[in-house]
């Protein structure tokens, strides 16, 4: 997991795929709070973005997700949310990994969870197999969130 500010994205450019990663960041920068929700493809099967609007959940309703094929780079365009990194060893699986959706789910266990507060201007990266629980309301501002999840195929980091 990486949590940082968008102005510092250059620290994380994978050397072998710098061109694709830089294209992905430029793609990400084009999204605004007025961007249309849905899937936006930059490089077929390598880089796409899911833009979504929602009201974050209460912590008690959260579930831990993980992926095997895609890295998540998550940032909010409007609003704020809490997001957690959660080691998956020892967690209870509640939905087996589905290759078609590149997602599996575990029950949340706060014992080893690492918290990150997501606001416009910062981002978090979750690598394949890293458990994460997004979309959790921030107590100070539980309002609607507009978010981009940039999906980067794992091969870009190999």
State the predicted function of each range:
Residues 49-67, 77-92, 128:
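Conserved short histidine dyad/triad with adjacent acidic residue
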Residues 69-81, 87, 96-107, 151-152:
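Short, conserved beta-strand element in jelly-roll/cupin
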Residues 85-87, 135-138:
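A short secondary-structure junction signal
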Residues 123-125, 141-158:
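A short hydrophobic beta-strand segment most commonly corresponding to one strand
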Residues 46, 70, 80-82, 122, ...:
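Structural motif
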Residues 43-44, 60-71, 89-98, 111, ...:
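A short beta-loop-beta micro-motif enriched in histidine and acidic residues
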Residues 117-137:
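Conserved metal-binding segment of the jelly-roll/cupin
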Residues 1-51, 63:
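A short, N-terminal "cap"/entry segment at the start of jelly-roll beta-barrel domains
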